[in-house]
Design a protein with these regions (language model features):
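N-terminal loops that bind phosphate or other acidic moieties
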Residues: 1-176
């Protein structure tokens, strides 16, 4: 709860997307609550920009991110350093990958995007990273549920590549 707020701000500041296009319902706020959320985030960004007229990526993530988000960025960067794939799932982890990609663009080479969630700015964030999620089923559940749905597809793909017969191994004659 509340991680869509820094994620929205990161999309605004790191992606150049107007804040009003970044702020969504998150865990389900509506109406005046959503308007209030936007106003609070707008004031937060204005206050930040007054103190940091030319912020670095580190300034942005330190000011607006929680320890769990900063930790996720570190894990993504370390995985890329080790040439390991990471499953990026949902709006918040996509925001972490966006931040990581601003520090080290090649981190995107090691990202598999599980799904595009129902948060309206998620698709915009994915497009900034040229990411194509495996699933786009409008979930807003959190807790890695998109990764759980996408993982069997990845596992099946790997098995097909590694275990499926080709024409030569199956002794099939080419007819052309």
């Amino acid at each position: 709860i509340a991680n869509t707020s820094p994620s929205s701000i990161w999309l605004n500041l790191l992606g150049g997307v107007p804040l009003e296009e970044c702020v969504g319902a998150g865990s389900g706020v509506k109406g005046t609550q959503l308007s209030h959320k936007y106003e609070v985030l707008k004031l937060s960004v204005e206050k930040f920009q007054n103190g940091f007229p030319h912020p670095s990526v580190n300034d942005i993530i330190r000011y607006f991110g929680g320890f769990e988000m900063v930790g996720a960025i570190g894990a993504m960067l370390r995985a890329a350093e080790k040439k390991m794939l990471v499953m990026v799932d949902g709006f918040i982890m996509s925001a972490c990958m966006l931040a990581a990609s601003k520090m080290y663009p090649a981190v995107l080479d090691y990202a598999v995007f599980g799904h595009c969630g129902d948060e309206h700015a998620h698709a915009r964030m994915l497009s900034l990273m040229n990411a194509r999620p495996i699933l786009n089923i409008g979930m807003r559940l959190g807790e890695g549920t998109g990764a759980l749905c996408a993982y069997p597809i990845i596992e099946s793909s790997v098995r097909m590549i590694n275990e499926m017969n080709n024409f030569e191994n199956a002794n099939i004659t080419k007819y052309f």
